Amino acid sequence: MAEQQGRELEAECPVCWNPFNNTFHTPKMLDCCHSFCVECLAHLSLVTPARRRLLCPLCRQPTVLASGQPVTDLPTDTAMLALLRLEPHHVILEGHQLCLKDQPKSRYFLRQPQVYTLDLGPQPGGQTGPPPDTASATVSTPILIPSHHSLRECFRNPQFRIFAYLMAVILSVTLLLIFSIFWTKQFLWGVG
């Protein structure tokens, strides 16, 4: 019982206490071999004055990052993911956002990838509210008319194409049934 409870304690980030997963709480290892979720490490890297050094929140041992290396490039704790029976996803840090591009696997047709983002806070020097000159001004937005290019993109959408194919098949079968009913009625009973 105590061993199982110890494993459950290991399966969560020691900073935010959220359970590890394979998205924004992916366990990343520092040089001291302590694991933290990528969200906590991203927050830590954004507030640290020395951008290339991360101090471990537990033992204070520094982890030196290469020039321009984000915290998402730190090694993933694969042993923890194996314990949780999860496969790692690639999470990237863009500015003050963590981004995850999830591409669902399908055998029959392509699906649009889903992109999940997690905002880590305001940009330094950014404003918290709307700019004062645009807050009082009201701007009327024109009605957008679909262009030739947007319709072309619509036709390239795999879900739309499958829908169009199914509707064409249903319409064809319906017309075939209607004509065959009238044809057999005229041929067999001589109506008309």
Swiss-Prot record:
Pathway as given in its UniProt record: Protein modification; protein ubiquitination
Induction: Up-regulated by ER stress in an ERN1-dependent manner.
Alphabetical keyword list: Apoptosis, Endoplasmic reticulum, Golgi apparatus, Lysosome, Membrane, Metal-binding, Transferase, Transmembrane, Transmembrane helix, Ubl conjugation, Ubl conjugation pathway, Zinc, Zinc-finger
Any single Gene Ontology cellular-component annotation: endoplasmic reticulum
EC number: 2.3.2.27
Result, substituting C13A: Abolishes autoubiquitination
TM region(s), chain numbering: 162-182
Main location: endoplasmic reticulum
CDD domains named in the record: RING-HC_RNF183-like (cd16556)
Catalyzed chemical reaction(s): S-ubiquitinyl-[E2 ubiquitin-conjugating enzyme]-L-cysteine + [acceptor protein]-L-lysine = [E2 ubiquitin-conjugating enzyme]-L-cysteine + N(6)-ubiquitinyl-[acceptor protein]-L-lysine
Enzyme class: transferase
Outcome following mutation: C16S: Loss of autoubiquitination and reduced ubiquitination of BCL2L1
GO molecular function, one term: zinc ion binding
Superkingdom of the source species: Eukaryota
Expression sites (tissue/organ): Kidney and testis.
Zn-finger region bounds: RING-type: 13-60
Subcellular location: Endoplasmic reticulum membrane; Endoplasmic reticulum; Golgi apparatus, cis-Golgi network membrane; Lysosome membrane
Listed GO biological process terms: apoptotic process; positive regulation of endoplasmic reticulum stress-induced intrinsic apoptotic signaling pathway; protein autoubiquitination; protein polyubiquitination; protein ubiquitination; response to endoplasmic reticulum stress
Protein modification: Autoubiquitinated (in vitro).
Residues in compartment: Cytoplasmic: 1-161
Outcome of substituting K105R: Loss of autoubiquitination but no effect on ubiquitination of BCL2L1
Subunit structure: Interacts with FATE1. Interacts with SEC16A. Interacts with BCL2L1.
Function recorded in the entry: Acts as an E3 ubiquitin ligase catalyzing the covalent attachment of ubiquitin moieties onto substrate proteins. Triggers apoptosis in response to prolonged ER stress by mediating the polyubiquitination and subsequent proteasomal degradation of BCL2L1. May collaborate with FATE1 to restrain BIK protein levels thus regulating apoptotic signaling.
Protein name (record): E3 ubiquitin-protein ligase RNF183
Gene: RNF183
